[in-house]
């Protein structure tokens, strides 16, 4: 078994496992299976400069969005969206986890997280840009354009 692990580790450029490691090469092997090209999809009007990067990992689909610091989100719309997700928004899949750092005021930023049915909101010192991550449950259908639309509707106008 160790010989098989060592030969697999050579494929992904890993060195020998640390003493006592229970999964010595799992991360390296998984990294080797990841796509090398990242597709960046523009989101919203060109002036908004939003972007989405789709993610497929361990049977889960999802994406990461980035919007520039000039874009602000409506805290009420974001919370309504996340509160409705357990089954109230058809056609977008069932999210397993949502995490975002969003500007919701002139100098007010929040960390928003949803795992299971729980939604939390907390102030954060992050000020670089708006970031959103969505991970669907395994096997859920992925409709990225529908998610793009949801985030655009949550922006303040």
What function would you assign to each model-found segment?
Residues 1-127, 138-141, 147-157:
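C-terminal accessory "lid"/substrate-recognition subdomains
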């Amino acid at each position: 078994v160790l010989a098989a692990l060592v030969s697999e580790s050579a494929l992904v450029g890993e060195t020998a496992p640390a003493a006592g490691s229970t999964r010595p090469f799992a991360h390296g092997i998984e990294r080797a299976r990841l796509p090398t090209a990242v597709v960046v999809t523009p989101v919203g009007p060109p002036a908004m400069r939003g972007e989405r990067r789709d993610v497929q990992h361990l049977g889960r689909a999802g994406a990461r969005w980035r919007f520039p610091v000039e874009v602000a989100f409506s805290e009420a719309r974001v919370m309504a969206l996340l509160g409705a997700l357990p089954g109230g928004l058809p056609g977008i899949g069932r999210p397993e986890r949502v995490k975002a750092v969003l500007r919701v005021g002139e100098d007010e930023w929040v960390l928003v997280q949803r795992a299971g049915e729980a939604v939390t909101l907390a102030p954060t010192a992050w000020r670089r840009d708006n970031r959103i991550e969505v991970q669907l449950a395994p096997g859920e259908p992925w409709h990225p354009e529908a998610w793009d639309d949801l985030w655009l509707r949550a922006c303040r106008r």
